[in-house]
């Protein structure tokens, strides 16, 4: 298995620290607002990778943190006239709800930053003792970036050039504009914890360093996050952790590509910013997940109506292949392994989901061909298609439920019309019964009558 390591800037053969085990950390959400489509992109990308590792037999420990104390959280809570706890709890629940709708697996561990304050304080104390950190005149503690010789190795940036082109706000207490805060002294009314430097709260960067150290150890296999976090967040994590622990922080770094909207950067100022809930009001979770998983994880992805409609058509092609056929493992044909090998080859090469999906469509085509000629063989291929779709986390909805929930006709209205048609038949008003059938047929709804009643599906 090879994949692109942002640290080295090239594809590398993956070698876990411990055979058959993977320790992976993914930077989680700062829960000051609703999750947006960019969050969905990042966490679906790493969910696919997590699922693939498990499919390949690895015992995966995935830690995905929650940043539940931050300047943005305090600011938003004050604006709303509520406590930070109320804001955080509501947004965590909303995050869990939308992630579940998108079929994102729960992480092995989901620490909140405030659960690891003692470990953060201990790391900061170590950094001060080693000369990597200092306390400013106002009480804040800062990291001394010039002390860390490898600063910039992840983002491939030179510290001297960064300093010259710095647009960082000049803070008098800092020795250098690039120095960043490790511990921030509390202002009146803000959440605070005791420390050797006075009551305050941790800086954002030290939170992830401490949580990963506590749950995965000083060195672990993979650190993941959105490409927007590469600098300064991930660069600062490396500086803190490697100075404190005197060893490599993470061996491999994975960064997911950003979402653009109609080829423009997504931002509230451009009025092209979408929350996950807003997107799911228009498109089924299956479609949204497929769309976000269909591009290589580290590439940019363009959010547009055309691309989502294409994703919808693709999802329906896969679902239609599995319609009216029962997946049966024991019926798996001997040559089915060829499809699985092609799927593995694609995913083993930097998690190439477009190529993996091409294999799934080849399988779907095979199933459709065999449905009328060899149902036994078709059912075996259907089992394999289901199995490989599960690796990508797609086709997680019941087939008929998906088509009932699809765009267009409302399910409750269809059920009312079916009930009216049933009554019309009882009353021997066959003209009205036929009229309803034709009306639904024009909406793409197919009725199937049986001794037990009438069922429907979208054609």
Swiss-Prot record:
HAMAP family: Cys_tRNA_synth. Disulfide bonds: none annotated. Belongs to the class-I aminoacyl-tRNA synthetase family. GO terms for biological process: cysteinyl-tRNA aminoacylation. NCBIfam families: cysS. Keywords: Aminoacyl-tRNA synthetase, ATP-binding, Cytoplasm, Ligase, Metal-binding, Nucleotide-binding, Protein biosynthesis, Zinc. It holds the Pfam family tRNA-synt_1e. Monomer. This is Cysteine--tRNA ligase. It catalyses: tRNA(Cys) + L-cysteine + ATP = L-cysteinyl-tRNA(Cys) + AMP + diphosphate. A motif ('KMSKS' region) lies at residues 265-269.
């Amino acid at each position: 298995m090879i994949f692109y390591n942002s640290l080295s800037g090239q594809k590398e053969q993956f070698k876990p620290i411990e055979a058959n085990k993977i320790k992976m950390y993914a930077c989680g959400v700062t829960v000051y607002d609703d999750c947006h489509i960019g969050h969905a992109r990042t966490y679906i990308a790493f969910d696919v990778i997590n699922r693939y590792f498990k499919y390949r037999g690895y015992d995966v420990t995935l830690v995905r943190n929650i940043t539940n104390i931050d300047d943005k959280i305090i600011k938003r809570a004050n604006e709303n006239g509520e406590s930070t706890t109320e804001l955080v709890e509501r947004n965590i629940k909303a995050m869990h709800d939308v992630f579940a709708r998108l079929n994102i697996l729960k992480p092995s561990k989901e620490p909140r930053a405030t659960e690891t304050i003692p470990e953060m304080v201990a790391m900061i104390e170590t950094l001060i003792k080693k000369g990597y950190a200092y306390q400013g005149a106002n009480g804040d503690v800062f990291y001394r970036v010039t002390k860390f010789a490898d600063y910039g190795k992840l983002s491939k940036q030179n510290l001297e050039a960064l300093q010259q082109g710095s647009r960082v706000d000049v803070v008098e207490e800092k020795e250098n504009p690039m120095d960043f805060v490790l511990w921030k002294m509390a202002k009146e009314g803000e959440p605070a914890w005791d420390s050797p430097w006075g009551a305050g709260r941790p800086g954002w960067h030290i939170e992830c360093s401490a949580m990963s150290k506590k749950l995965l150890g000083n060195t672990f296999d993979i650190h993941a996050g959105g490409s927007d976090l590469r600098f300064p967040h991930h660069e600062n994590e490396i500086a803190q952790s490697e100075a404190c622990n005197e060893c490599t922080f993470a061996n491999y770094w994975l960064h997911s590509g950003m979402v653009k909207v109609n080829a423009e950067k997504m931002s509230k100022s451009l009025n092209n910013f979408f929350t996950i809930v807003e997107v799911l009001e228009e498109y089924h979770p299956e479609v949204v997940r497929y769309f976000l998983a269909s591009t290589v994880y580290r590439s940019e992805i363009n959010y547009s109506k055309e691309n989502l409609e294409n994703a919808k058509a693709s999802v329906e092609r896969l679902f239609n292949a599995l319609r009216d056929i029962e997946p049966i493992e024991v019926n798996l044909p001997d040559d089915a392994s060829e499809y699985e090998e092609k799927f593995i080859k694609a995913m083993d090469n930097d998690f190439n989901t477009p190529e993996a999906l091409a294999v799934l469509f080849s399988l779907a085509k095979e199933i459709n061909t065999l449905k009328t000629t060899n149902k036994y063989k078709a059912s075996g291929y259907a089992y394999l298609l289901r199995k490989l779709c599960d690796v990508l986390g797609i086709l997680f909805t019941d087939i008929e439920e998906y088509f009932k929930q699809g765009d267009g006709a409302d399910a409750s209205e269809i059920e009312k019309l079916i009930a009216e048609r049933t009554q019309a038949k009882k009353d021997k008003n066959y003209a009205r019964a036929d009229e309803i059938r034709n009306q639904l047929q024009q909406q793409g709804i197919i009725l199937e009558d049986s001794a037990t009643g009438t069922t429907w599906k979208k054609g």
